[in-house]
Amino acid sequence: LIRKHFGYDKWLVCGGSWGTTLAMAYGICFPQCVTGFILRGVFLGSKSENNWLYQRDGAAKFFPDAYRDFLQPLAEKHKLDPLSGYHQLLQSDNEVAAIAASKAWYLWELRISSLEHTHITSSYIEDKHQAWCMSLVSNHYLYHSCFLADDYFFNNIAKIKSIPAILLHGRYDMVCQVDVAYALTEAWDNATLQIIPQAGHGGFESQTIDAFCKATDVMAKFLEQDIN
C-alpha cells in the first residue's frame, strides 16, 4: 500500500533483525516489486534461531547473569520453555505480572544486543508502554514460529536469488547468529555479506551505521548502472 501510494513500481527494501524477515518475506511474495535488498542482522525465524536466543545453550552461555534475570519472572515449570512461559505472562489479565514480564523480556535483548551499551538508558526499561508493546508483539510472532515453515526462506530462495542484496552482520551479534547470514549468502546468487568486525546486533553501533551508509551508496550506484 505504501509503495502504491507513492506511485513506485519497484523499490529498494531494507530491514534490520526482524525487519530482515519481513523484507525477505515481502520479496518472496512480490519479487517483481523489489530492486534490491539491504539487510542488517539477518533473522530467518527458525527454531534453531529461537533456541539460540531463548534457551540455555545459546546466548545465555555468554550472558549468564542477564539470562538469570530473564528467567526470574517465570515459574519454575516454564524456565525450560521461556517462549511459552512468557507467552502466558504477557497475555495475562494480571497487569502487574504482564508489565514486569515485558520489562524483563525487553531488557534481555537490550543487554545482549550491543557492544556499545551507552544507548541503554533507564528510559528504555522504565517506559512500560514501549516495553510491553515490543515484548507482546515479538513474543507473539516468535511463539508462533513467525507463522513460517522452519526452512521457508531457503526453500523459497529461488524467487529472490537474482535480486541484488547486501547483507550486514556484526561479528559479535548475540541476538542473530552470523552463520545464518553466511548460509543465506551461500544460497543467494546475487548477495554479498559484510561481517562488521567490531559490532554486535544493535543498529546504532558506530561501525554498523558506517557500514549501512556505505551499503546504500554501493547499492545506489549499482542500481543506477543497471538502469542505464
Residues covered by each model-derived region:
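Catalytic active-site module of serine/aspartate enzymes centered on a nucleophile-bearing elbow/loop
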Residues: 191-228
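Active-site-adjacent alpha-helix of alpha/beta-hydrolase-fold enzymes
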Residues: 100, 178-191
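Conserved hydrolase catalytic core segment
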Residues: 9-48
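Short beta-strand/loop motif that positions the catalytic acidic residue
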Residues: 160-161, 167-169, 173
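Conserved alpha/beta-hydrolase "acid-adjacent" motif
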Residues: 149, 174-180
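Active-site nucleophile elbow and catalytic-triad environment of alpha/beta-hydrolase enzymes
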Residues: 140-157
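A catalytic-pocket lid/entrance helix-loop region that shapes and gates access to the active site
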Residues: 32-86
